[in-house]
Amino acid sequence: MPLTYIGGDLVLTNNRSLQRLNGFGSLKHLGGNVSILDNGAIPEEPSDDNVIGFCKIKYYEMAGILDEEATVQLGRSTSLIDFNSLSPCPYEVVEDISGTFKAVPANRFLNSIGMNTSINSRGENVNTTEEIMRYLGARWIRTSVGGSVSSLTNLPETSLPGAGTSIASYKQLYDNAGIRFSAGLGAGGQERNIPNLINNVKRIIDATSPDAIIAIEGNNEPNNRNWYVIFEGEVGGGNKEGKNNWKPVARMQKKLYEDVKADPVLGKDGYNYPVWSLTDGGASGENVGLQYLKVPEDDMAVPEEFRGVTFADVANLHNYFNHPSFKFPQNNQTWRAAEPSTNVPPGCDVLYRHFGVTWLNKYKGYLTDEELEALPRVTTETGSTISDAVTEEMQGLLYMSLYLAQFAQGFDYTAMYLLTDRRDESGNQSFGFYDKFYNPRQSAHYLHNLTTILKDDKDIDEPGELTYSITGRTITVHDLLLQKNNGTFELVIWGEKYEGGSDRITVGFDQTYDEVWVYNPTKGTAPEMVLNNVNSIELDISNHPYIIEIGEHPESSVEDMKNDDFQIRAFPNPVIRNLTIYSDTEIGKVSLFDMMGNCVYTGRVYDKVYTVDMDNLPAGAYILSVLDESGNCIKKQKVIKS
């Protein structure tokens, strides 16, 4: 339990191991005096918006947690800090907002939500990929169709489930679920990979629609391990002989851009798909200008060969929010990772470190806030494994916040790494919304709830404006005004106070609304509150979103939404080990029958999520039967055990 109440004095003396004041983030009352002397490295002034130092005590005074008459001694017994001169920690400073704000189409936010997945290979199954993408409400997949240094990607026309990604795999996902794709060169490669990629993209378009492709992407992390490139016989990037020779990497990206733009289908005379930059350009071993989308003609630090060259239309990042140099928990963890300006959080792999001043060798690119914030930008990898610090619950909260923070700060697309855990490599076994047996994690349910509440299928023609204020807003409270195509406003307000505590805010409106619905995606898809004749709402904001809905609401009543929405999903299918059943209503009983009608499994549930262990059942076909609490059959489905 977090520490919330101290009735008397707070005395911390001669504790050399004490670092910061992280354990006091949730304190609501401090009844006595404060003496913190001769301790460890407690910062006097914070260097960023996360450090909990003596500024926390100043906040206690400002917020009334500490009596203004209390005696405060901080620092060293021989050299006290002037408490009166301290400022509150930046993340505690109240920054109220008030005004009339223009909405962004809700559909545009939903379109930004993407995944990294192998679709129908590496142990993944296209049928289940479709099912779980639908459940999550994710709209696009980052895919590689170029090949590698040693091989080309040859997409067959068709393939069996789990037997490799084919043109038919892309067609199934697009035709059935509207899923779109970015198409990348992949990790490593040679110049021959470029025409291979272009050909595969055109085959996908022929089988689906021009709308199925979002963009063409450059090489994946050419600084990494063996993901070097060979261009015209010369090795560049990676960690071998090309480590400090990035000219082949730049030439590869330059040729990709030129060939895509010159192609009659993909290029300027065709659908003119944007080209995304390669990733981790901030690790360039030499200054070849990859810190620019288009290299200025007058940047004499870049070789003449690359001056004036256009490498990409869009900046592409792998700005992981949980990184060895930016570890969880920190307040504003995902918000700071999405920072688009020169205000660089310590240790965070942000836009500036790849397109401002590169993190490895300090090559200079875009140096002003205006230049950086104007860059079109996407993220094609980010995420976090589960650990002692990042629990499954916390991962779910972070993933929701990540998509919101990225979009609110100008990222058009964000792909999480990963849709499901890898089955063929170590170290990546808990990134996924699903584990390798397709069991959903909390992150899957939370994202499902968020996208279901915001569900929309097209952009509103002319987004409207909403007048509102947020009082009591601190630096960890964020807002995003969305609007559905039917005119309904969805005001998303979320917090990133991951070190504990909450902020009581008041959302005020310039008029009284007959009915306002307030959703909490951690609780489900039905409104947590339905308020009538309201012009203000009080909320405690901590580490998850609330969604305030103004306008048209779902036609069903709240009670109907809770009890009459019989959407039952069972996946994966085919199943390897565990079959997970998720329902929007309470399940009473689950049974499995073989094809002879024999009951081979039955279980009482009384919950919305249930897992059937099919590991010991023979391979073959089974009939799944799901009953509600009253014994009514609400689902029958054929299930294949592989």
Give the location of each predicted region.
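C-terminal outer-membrane/trafficking sorting elements
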Residues: 561-571, 575-642
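Noncatalytic carbohydrate-binding groove/subsite architecture in carbohydrate-active enzymes
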Residues: 245-398, 409
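Carbohydrate-binding surface patches
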Residues: 467-514
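Aromatic/acidic polysaccharide-binding cleft in carbohydrate-active enzymes
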Residues: 383-454, 463-469
